[in-house]
Every structure is written in C-alpha cells, then in structure tokens.
Amino acid sequence: MRKPPNERLTGQPRTPAEAGGQVEEAGPQPSPGNDKHIPERKCILSGAHGARDDLIRLALGPDGQVAPDVRAKAPGRGAWIGVDRATLDTANEKGKLKGALARSFKSGAVSAPADLGAQIETALRRAVLDRLGLEARAGNLLSGAEKIEGAARKGDVHLLIHASDAGADGRSKLDQAWRMGGGEPQGLVFPEERAILSLALGRQNVVHVALIDRAAAARVRHALDRWRAFIGPNEGQIAATAGPPVASAVDGYEG
C-alpha cells in the first residue's frame, strides 16, 4: 500500500525496486547490522523515504539508460526506487518511470530498459545466493534438520530459513525448536526450492538453513527481505503452505 510522501518506509520486507527521487553519487555505505548511521533516500515513484540500504539504486549509464545497481557501488549518478516489481513494471509500461527519471536526472534523454524489473529481480536473487554462500564458507551457517534442531533448542540460531518445497512437518518441528530456544515464532520461507539452496551452498538436499552468527543473520535477512519485498513477500510460499506436505517423509534427513 502506498505511503504518504514524507512517511518512512516500514513494515514488511522492502522492495528492492522503488525509485529514489534523488540523484546522487554512489559512495561507501555501512553494512546491515552495524550501528552506523544509514542515510535515507526518496523513491522517485512513490515519494516515500526509506533507508538507503533498503531501496534500490538505478545507475545512469553513458548511453543514457539506467541499470540496476542493487549494491549501490556503481560510479556516477543514480536514482532510487522502493516499489515492488508489479508496481515498477506498470510504471515502466505506462511511461511513469520515464517521467520520474527525467525529473530526477533533469534530462528527458534518460530511459529504462523494458525488462528492468526482471533485471532487478535477477540481481537481488543473486545477491541472496552469494550472501548465503559467503556465510556458509565462513562457518556461520548450518544445514541439516538434526543439526539445526539441536542448535535452535540451545538458542544458537539467529535466523531460520525453509525452502519453499520443505515439508510441513519438518518446518513445524524446527519452528517449534527455534521458539523453545528463544527465537522467533517461525522461520522465513525462501522464495525458491531446495535445489536452488543446495546449489548456492554447494551441498546436497538443503531444505533448511540456520544462521548461527548474529551479524551474519542480519546480513542474510536484509538481502532476503529486499528480494522478497520486490517480488512480493508471499512469492514462493504457496508450495510451502498449500496442499499436502511436500517430502515430509525425508525432512529428518535433509542436508
């Protein structure tokens, strides 16, 4: 739901593709989970303000076309967006995005590719998979239902993630263990199936993932929230919540 122009974006995961109403030079920014001040930016489409780390930067190329810069590291000028993909695609199709870009960059020569929404979604997805891989290599991540259950009951799990095709029984069991260990009511549903989680981590049959380092959990949650917010927070959850449990018979042996 659209918020008033001067209201800060809050609530559910923020969508990575909302247009920021400001043009600025890219520069270093603090990482999620630390105590440093994070500047705000304004979405060029909705007019809502939000933390720079939560919005998506569009970098202006030499050809006058914008491209996704989800890590906000590209040099040169940029604009910011904070709407979901459906809103962005509609704005792009109807010319509203082009008008917003023209106002932000003060030039009518700026354009956006027709598949900008798809490009942003791909970039956000890649950012999540890369982050999971990095945390796994750093030893900050567990997979395997039995390992996760034990760590969760001891209070060592700071973020719990289920693949979209995880069985209902397995999810419920780990959610309960996490609650008993002082965690949240339930884990987050990953927007894709176990095959993608397994590929990202270089392991077989990864259905559940737990972050056992607080800072690592904050980094993964931030990347995952941005992706889920852009594609829609319920995207990928149908398989995990509707119909009979999926592969619940093997949940106890998930890697």
Describe the predicted segments one by one:
Residues V189-A242, V246:
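Helix-rich interaction surfaces within compact, conserved domain-sized segments
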Residues A86-H162, G167-G170:
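Extended interfacial segments that mediate partner engagement and assembly in macromolecular machines
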Residues G50-T87, A151-D156, I161-R171, D175-A177, ...:
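Compact, Lys/Arg-rich rRNA/RNP-binding cores from ribosome-related proteins
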Residues M1-A100:
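N-terminal cysteine/histidine-rich coordination modules
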Residues M1-T10, K42-L45, D156, S172-Q186:
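Short helix-coil boundary/hinge micro-motifs
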Residues K73, G95, A100, S104, ...:
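Electropositive, gly/pro-rich neighborhoods at or near active sites that engage anionic ligands
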